[in-house]
Amino acid sequence: MEQRISLITLGVADLRRAAAFYERVIGWKAESSPPGVVFFALNGVVFGLWPHDELAKDMGTTSDGVSAYRGYALAHNVRSEAEVDAIFGRLKEHGATILKQPQKAFWGGYSGYFSDPDGHTWEIAYNPFWTIQQDGRVSMKKE
């Protein structure tokens, strides 16, 4: 298996609301998608939104028992602490729950956590040891 992730799909309660959240708050643009799912192209990785029940059915399970803590966090790295703060400034008015306000992190960066309207946990982070290329790709080396 090659070392990459091609698609990350989140189960959501309200597809229209979830798509609007990622478009308005995060600033992503949805791609042309089949009915009932929304895709965003993110520099080689596709990010998808699909209703909980449909995703569970596709996985051969049910969507019962979705808990608040799911044992993961998705992360979006930005180019400055100010950019972290700007994103957090928009979150609450669009249905996000702030889990941890942005602050200096033990690893030398600056980050905060929120959950989107469907409870998916996100970290918005500035890592001074990584470089974000012009096209948005992240390099784990400072250039």
Model segments located where?
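Helix-adjacent hinge/juxtasegments
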Residues: 61-77
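N-terminal beta-strand motif that seeds the catalytic metal site of vicinal oxygen chelate
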Residues: 1-17, 71-76, 128-143
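Vicinal oxygen chelate
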Residues: 12-16, 74-117
